[in-house]
């Protein structure tokens, strides 16, 4: 209550009308972590065109409802700011006098509020001339909903921090744990032969692809499930590596129960979540996680070195801790993937499964199958001559087997090592988009139009095969569709959102290093995919940066 009154006092001193969250909005914020993990299943298909599939998911429904609930309050605040600015301008025109610093400070929040919607207005204008008008309008609508929701959250996060902060973080950990458990269940059911329609596995996620399943949870693909796990992973690492300095703090108090179970969860939950991340075999999310953990490791080392009272054993312990965080779940998941391959429907063995996974994660640089083959090459060549006659007789015998027996023989998986073609397709799309973007100055400045990337690329490069092919890089997609102007606008919007948070939260705390590495991890993953529906969690989990 004191924080809320303090926030109101600060706002009144600035001449700013305050806002507040309704009970429904508070409940929706607490439900947000659970909604985000149902990013595709269940889905409501609306209609489909030659360029786009229009579907409604639970996160999109959450966003739409929250934005609608936020609209009346935001409309009232914007109208008030507009009146203040117009009144101040008319008063200045009548009695011109040098503006004082006090007046500047008084009108600053109103100008800031009015400018926060500059990016949604820009994309709306940009969508008018888009070749893919329907997709453009719907995309601009999603952007409007995101901006309105973020403004509402950032304007109120400080006064509700102690009320919903711990519960929000706890719910995020619970949601991540349940989703991870479902991923392992998906894998087990797939190995047991349960049809894909019942397991919700995508076509490219089943065991016949690599020999072991790489689950997608309730997401459309495994890479999006892996991306969703990043937030609970870094939150669990926060509670593992950073013990709350003030145990009486409502915000940073430990979400785990004060028992042996809580102690086990503190250490086991991060490892379980990271193991699930490896199980998805999403290179984009895994590489982003590795980079962010390395940055976190460097930060911890520098922080300990700066402490004069730091003991050497504590400093030397850090590499062991971070190595355990990264490699223990990796070894566990590799063993599980090998076991799934051994028990799965393909002819591959435990070693083949481990080799395939390592080859994928190393981009083909480490091929255990080739290394093992070279070490046994001499022995195999020596035995080949002695068993030549036996093989010939076996061939004659196999030719006499009936077709039913031949059909029952297990087949090898579709891929047994790093799929270079997958990476080449993504890189080729990026190259084609850049070459198309550079064809005219107008296109470089304003882009091809919101939502028109797939259609434009298909018209200029029919060999792509479908206008539904999109650029698998969010930054490049923004540059191609909205041009340099769009990039500048979105950077300005990000700055305005940060200033809005600082304005409404005068006693704001510095963002925790864990929030920063999470933001870094999210930023890196956007290099591997694009599309607002698949990236909603990146924008809607922004409050987490201020709750740590």
Tell me what each language-model feature is.
Residues 111-121, 133-155, 171:
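Aromatic-anchored transmembrane helix interface
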Residues 481-521:
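Hydrophobic transmembrane alpha-helices and their immediate junctions
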Residues 72, 181, 187-190, 279, ...:
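A membrane-periplasm/extracellular boundary helix in multi-pass inner-membrane enzymes
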Residues 3-4, 8-81, 122-129:
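N-terminal signal-anchor transmembrane segment
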Residues 26, 67, 120-124, 145-150, ...:
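Alpha-helical transmembrane segments of multi-pass inner-membrane proteins
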Residues 417-482:
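Long extracytoplasmic/lumenal interhelical loops at the membrane interface
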Residues 2-22, 261, 500-513, 530, ...:
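A juxtamembrane structural motif centered on a specific transmembrane helix
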Residues 59-69, 293-297, 493-494, 514-548:
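Transmembrane alpha-helices of multi-pass inner-membrane enzymes
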């Amino acid at each position: 209550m004191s924080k809320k009154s303090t926030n109101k006092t600060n706002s009144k001193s600035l001449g700013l009308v305050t806002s507040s969250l309704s009970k429904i909005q508070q409940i929706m914020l607490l439900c947000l972590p659970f909604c985000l993990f149902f990013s595709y299943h269940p889905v409501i298909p609306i209609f489909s065109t030659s360029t786009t599939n229009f579907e409604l998911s639970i996160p999109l429904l959450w966003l739409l409802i929250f934005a609608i609930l936020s609209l009346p309050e935001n409309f009232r605040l914007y109208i008030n700011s507009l009146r203040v600015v117009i009144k101040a301008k008319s008063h200045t025109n009548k009695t011109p006098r040098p503006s004082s610093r006090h007046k500047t400070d008084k009108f600053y929040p109103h100008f800031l509020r009015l400018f926060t919607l500059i990016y949604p207005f820009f994309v709306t204008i940009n969508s008018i001339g888009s070749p893919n008008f329907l997709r453009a309008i719907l995309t601009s609508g999603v952007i409007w909903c995101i901006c309105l929701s973020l403004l509402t959250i950032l304007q109120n996060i400080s006064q509700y921090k102690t009320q919903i902060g711990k519960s929000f973080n706890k719910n995020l950990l619970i949601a991540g744990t349940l989703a991870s458990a479902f991923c392992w269940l998906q894998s087990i059911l797939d190995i047991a032969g349960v049809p894909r329609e019942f397991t919700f596995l995508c076509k490219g996620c089943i065991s016949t692809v690599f020999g072991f399943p790489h689950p997608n949870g309730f997401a459309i693909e495994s890479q999006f499930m892996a991306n969703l796990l990043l937030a609970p992973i870094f939150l669990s690492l926060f509670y593992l590596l950073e013990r709350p300095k003030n145990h009486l703090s409502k915000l940073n108090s430990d979400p785990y129960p004060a028992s042996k179970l809580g102690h086990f969860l503190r250490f086991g939950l991060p490892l379980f979540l990271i193991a699930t991340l490896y199980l998805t075999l999403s290179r984009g999310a895994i590489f982003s996680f590795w980079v962010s953990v390395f940055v976190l490791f460097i930060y911890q080392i520098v922080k300990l070195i700066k402490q004069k009272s730091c003991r050497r054993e504590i400093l030397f312990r850090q590499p062991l801790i971070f190595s355990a965080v990264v490699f223990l779940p990796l070894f566990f998941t590799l063993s599980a993937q090998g076991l799934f391959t051994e028990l799965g429907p393909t002819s591959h063995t435990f070693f083949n499964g481990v080799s395939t996974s390592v080859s994928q994660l190393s981009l083909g640089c480490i091929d255990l199958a080739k290394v093992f083959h070279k070490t046994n090459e001499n022995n195999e060549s020596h035995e080949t001559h002695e068993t030549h006659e036996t093989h010939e007789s076996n061939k004659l015998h196999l030719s006499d087997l009936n077709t039913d027996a031949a059909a029952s023989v297990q087949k090898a998986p579709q891929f047994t090592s790093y799929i270079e073609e997958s990476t080449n397709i993504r890189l080729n799309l990026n190259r084609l988009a850049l070459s198309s973007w550079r064809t005219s100055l107008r296109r470089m400045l304003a882009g091809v139009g919101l939502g028109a990337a797939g259609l434009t690329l298909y018209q200029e490069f029919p060999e792509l095969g479908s206008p539904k092919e999109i650029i698998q890089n969010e930054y490049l997609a923004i540059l191609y569709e909205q041009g340099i102007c769009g990039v500048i606008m979105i950077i300005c919007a990000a700055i305005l959102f940060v200033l809005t948070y600082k304005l409404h939260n005068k006693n704001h705390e510095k963002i925790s290093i864990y929030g920063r590495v999470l933001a870094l991890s999210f930023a890196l993953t956007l290099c591997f995919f694009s599309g607002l529906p698949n990236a909603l969690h990146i924008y809607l989990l922004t409050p987490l940066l201020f709750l740590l």
